Amino acid sequence: MAKRTKKVGIVGKYGTRYGASLRKMVKKMEITQHSKYTCSFCGKDSMKRAVVGIWSCKRCKRTVAGGAWVYSTTAAASVRSAVRRLRETKEQ
C-alpha cells in the first residue's frame, strides 16, 4: 500500500494525479462506501457494502439493496415515509 498522509487520507493512493478537487470528491465517496453502518434488523454496526448497491450484515447475514455509496439514501427515506403515511390513511 502507498503511504497516506493525515491530510489526504484514503485518496493518498492517487498521489498527485487527477487534481485536488476531484480527489476531494472521491474521498467523500470512498469514506462513505467503506464505512460500517448500523443494521436495521439486528441493530449492530456491521452493515458493509458488498458490491454497488448491495449491503450485507456480517452479524445477522441479511442482505439488502441500498444506495451505491451509502446504505440509506434520501430518496429511500422519503419513499419509506410516504408508504408509512399511506398505510396509516388506509387503516383509518
From Swiss-Prot:
Extract the InterPro entries matched here: Ribosomal_eL37/eL43 (IPR011331), Ribosomal_eL43 (IPR002674), Ribosomal_protein_eL43 (IPR050522), Ribosomal_zn-bd (IPR011332)
Q: What GO biological process term is on the record, naming one? A: cytoplasmic translation
Keywords associated with the record: Metal-binding, Ribonucleoprotein, Ribosomal protein, Zinc, Zinc-finger
| Keyword Cell division attached | no
Instruction: Zinc fingers (C4-type): give the ranges.
Output: 39-60
Query: Which GO CC annotations does the UniProt entry carry?
Result: cytosolic large ribosomal subunit; cytosolic ribosome
Gene Ontology MF term list: structural constituent of ribosome; zinc ion binding
Q: Which Pfam families match?
A: Ribosomal_L37ae (PF01780)
Q: Which family does it belong to?
A: Belongs to the eukaryotic ribosomal protein eL43 family.
**Protein name in the entry:** Large ribosomal subunit protein eL43
Q: Which organism is it from?
A: Drosophila melanogaster (Fruit fly)
